[in-house]
């Protein structure tokens, strides 16, 4: 059976870089994206948000990567991604995440992986918005 394509929220990418536990769900998701182990979706604004977060000085101090190293990771992610253009969608629970809702609306089979509790609790997207641990558990 083919796995559905996923959208990976920025908080999962950042947590994957920050964790010291290689077996943690966020680390496994980031490693899977870098290794093209499952299909995932990007678009320009999401990749830009990944970059903006990963190169923040406070985060760089914690993950220890240079800007060039962070950009190399982003390049790898972009090379393995399915690129889609977002479409209009219902309002997201958090207006700052509207672009994720619009990307989710592009295809009925997409699933969003996030650690954002507000997004995870959205009743209208139940089953389409899952936690990193739920994604990893379903993959096993």
Sequence positions of predicted segments:
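Acidic, PIN/NYN-like endoribonuclease modules and their adjacent C-terminal/linker elements
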Residues: 90, 94, 105-113, 117-140
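PIN-domain endoribonuclease scaffold, especially VapC-family toxins
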Residues: 31-88
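Conserved glycosyltransferase catalytic-site signature
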Residues: 10, 94-98
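Short, well-structured N-terminal submotif of metal-dependent ribonuclease cores
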Residues: 1-42
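Short, flexible loop segments at the rims of nucleotide/cofactor-binding pockets, characterized by
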Residues: 16-19, 63, 87-93
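Short, active-site-adjacent cap segments at secondary-structure transitions
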Residues: 13-14, 48-49, 119-121
